[in-house]
Amino acid sequence: MKTDIEIAQSIELKPIVDVVEKLGISYDDLELYGKYKAKLSFDKIRAVESNPVGKLILVTAINPTPAGEGKSTLTIGLADALNKIGKKTMIAIREPSLGPVMGIKGGAAGGGYAQVLPMEDINLHFTGDMHAITTANNALSALIDNHLHQGNELGIDQRRILWKRVVDLNDRALRHVTVGLGGPLNGIPREDGFDITVASEIMAILCLATDIEDLKRRLANIVIGYRYDRTPVSVGDLQVEGALALILKDAIKPNLVQTIYGTPAFVHGGPFANIAHGCNSVLATTTALHLADYTVTEAGFGADLGAEKFLDIKTPNLPTSPDAVVIVATLRALKMNGGVAKDALTEENVEAVRAGFANLKRHVENIRKFGIPAVVAINEFVSDTEAEIAVLKELCASIDVPVELASVWADGAEGGVALAETVVKTIAENPANYKRLYDNDLSVQEKIEKIVTEIYRGSKVNFEKKSQTQIAQIVQNGWDKLPICMAKTQYSFSDNPNALGAPENFEITIRELVPKLGAGFIVALTGDVMTMPGLPKRPAALNMDVESDGTVLGLF
């Protein structure tokens, strides 16, 4: 079979104007970036707000292998299949970060015959949103350092500045840096560091803001650090929220592209789910709900991270809650969660599938806690065997969860028809009764304990001394009614990436709590989660190239 990029380059794209015409979007509603990419104007976004709200399908997954389990591929393939069976459907997904594209992933626009196109553009610079977010973030850093240099009227304690610079790359050498060296003309020396752009609070803000005014309000609320008297300093205190919003004025508008089968897709925003809330923009999802009868969206990593955050953080900002949740499972991930070594995942092992099913079962139970019906999608791989598939279907039947095999990677829309029909039937026969996991009025400790004990199934939460001090500070400043955004490994329910399957009786340690007032949540850091990833021993970048005619090589 052709590679992803060979498939993508073999497709004759339709002009984006023609793709979105069936949604009632005209040429005048678009801000074009060439023939195949566009942003949707705010005038059109506001015009469709009075339209009925369609059905929302959330795609999540079991705890993944390092290569991922194909959530984006399944999301795209399911939407194509829904359109194939006559359902007016849109996609709303995140845009890739260049760091992982150059690192381990090599691309993040779906795969096989379930891709959003033009995949080369989407995986690289797209419409420039990532660069705008990077620039806004670093402009704030420059303005903070300039304030210190020009007399520090606000009394900012340079030892307690929370705000870091960012770059959209995996670069471990930048995690800890010192700025302001070289004498009095070069600023005030202080410790600083870089995060990856998708970990920036500005990325989270962009994905939760509903318009320019809300964007400015959220930007003004960012806490950049503390004064010498330990009181917080915000972007509003610096009076630069307008300048930051100006940099982001186009980035906030959702991007429109198409799938291989011509399904219209919003690809907008890209926070990670292990260090942020892991969902595409509220604006894109909300607008899709007003334009289509069905919207298919996804949340990053496993359901313990992305789906929990989608349901507890993003959903309250949407006009509706998910009508169904599709949990993507692969036999290789089930076998890994069942104790099989990574180099043996392609070998048949029915007993490992049985053992790893405990992981999938827990995710199904967790989704049901939110009052939403679950459907399991088996993302088919060539190494899957009939015996393994049969036992997984048998196990799903034992907990009364619908399950369908999906071959959208190899077969495109046709390979997702059975899944699409099952999802539509599930929505029709099992109306959702959404409820959040916790009430925001609970204490910070109680909210974290709810997530740990009810979603992860841990037995206890330990708060390190630093986090205890930060909780007291959060309460003192009146921030304790915000939801919690857990920063945790994606590979395990616990904070230990090696504790696979469905671990029990484990304790989770909270080492730090970071207020993200602009985004509207508090990040609870566990384990060794890094906000600036590093590159692997053999980065995907080593296989990338561009030919003299501009043809891109090596993305996948």
UniProtKB/Swiss-Prot annotation:
> Is Cell cycle found in the keyword set?
no
Signal peptide (from-to):
none
UniProt key word ATP-binding? yes
Extract one GO molecular function annotation from the record: ATP binding
Which GO annotations describe the biological process of this protein?
tetrahydrofolate interconversion
Binding locations of ATP:
T65, P66, A67, G68, E69, G70, K71, S72
Task: State which Enzyme Commission number(s) the record gives.
Answer: 6.3.4.3
| Functional pathway | One-carbon metabolism; tetrahydrofolate interconversion
Catalytically driven reaction(s): (6S)-5,6,7,8-tetrahydrofolate + formate + ATP = (6R)-10-formyltetrahydrofolate + ADP + phosphate
Q: Which UniProt keywords apply?
A: ATP-binding, Ligase, Nucleotide-binding, One-carbon metabolism
Please give the superkingdom of this protein's source.
Bacteria
A Pfam family found in this protein is FTHFS
Q: Which NCBIfam families does this entry report, sorted A to Z?
A: PRK13505.1
What family does the Swiss-Prot or TrEMBL record give for this protein?
Belongs to the formate--tetrahydrofolate ligase family.
Name of the protein in its database record: Formate--tetrahydrofolate ligase
Gene expressing this chain:
fhs
